[in-house]
């Protein structure tokens, strides 16, 4: 995620907007793929992984498994959040990433307060993914609008062939 700020800034400065779009797509594909695989690993082997750190406390293992299942299943959203946030920052935008961060905190707090009362610990665990969604929505919209706006810039200069 964080490398996207430098990547986007360098390519923006070079006027190579298509490369920004291509890089974000490739980074998103890699990150989402890895996140989905790790989410599956968390769900299938979560109990075994937790057992490496917790022994003899079945209630701790059970609650940790709930946490891993809920959060691990949504890491792909978090990966997109980081990619969009840092790409926008690299393109010189600060308002939307800041607004998205505020939205993330508010959504997380609201979800924790409401859902914990309704669903207990599982509801509290849902606060993170819902906060990520609340932040990712404005970031993804801003990213798409920004890329559309930047597509009107002059095309990237041709690479000289030596």
Which residue ranges define each predicted feature?
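Small-residue-rich hydrophobic transmembrane alpha-helices
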Residues: 1-40, 44-46, 78-92, 96-100
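Membrane-helix cytosolic exit motif
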Residues: 5, 13, 139-150
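Hydrophobic alpha-helical interface/terminus motif in multipass membrane transporters
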Residues: 8, 49-50, 88, 115, ...
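Transmembrane-helix signature of multi-pass solute transporters
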Residues: 28, 33, 37-41, 107-111, ...
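Residue-level recognition of transmembrane alpha-helices
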Residues: 31, 68-71, 75, 101-102, ...
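Short membrane-interface helical motifs at transmembrane helix boundaries
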Residues: 37-58, 65
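Membrane-interface helix-loop junctions in multi-pass transport and translocation proteins
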Residues: 48, 105-137, 147, 154-155
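Alpha-helical transmembrane segments of multi-pass membrane proteins
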Residues: 58-84
